[in-house]
């Protein structure tokens, strides 16, 4: 299992799920990120997530297959 973190910029309160997948190079494009999310492959805080623009905040945990990403401030 691969564990990773994403640190929010001091001026940001959140990052959208789709943007996180692109920044972490899990998805090659916005369209690819959308498909990953719509297919139900992403969990946020233990719940299956289908909202591509889900706002991720510090303390949230995103899981996709063998990848776990912790959001920090």
Cite the ranges covered by each PLM segment:
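A detector for short, charged/polar N-terminal pre-domain segments
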Residues: 2-13
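A basic, amphipathic helix-loop patch mediating RNA/tRNA/ribosome contacts
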Residues: 12-55
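Structural signature of FAD isoalloxazine-binding scaffolds in flavoprotein oxidoreductases
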Residues: 63
């Amino acid at each position: 299992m691969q564990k990773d973190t994403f640190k929010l910029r001091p001026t940001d309160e959140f990052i959208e799920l789709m943007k996180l997948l692109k920044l972490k190079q899990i998805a090659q494009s916005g369209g690819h990120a959308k498909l990953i999310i719509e297919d139900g492959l992403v969990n946020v805080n233990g719940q299956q997530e289908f909202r591509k623009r889900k706002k991720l905040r510090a303390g949230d945990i995103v899981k996709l297959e063998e990848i776990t990403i912790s959001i920090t401030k």
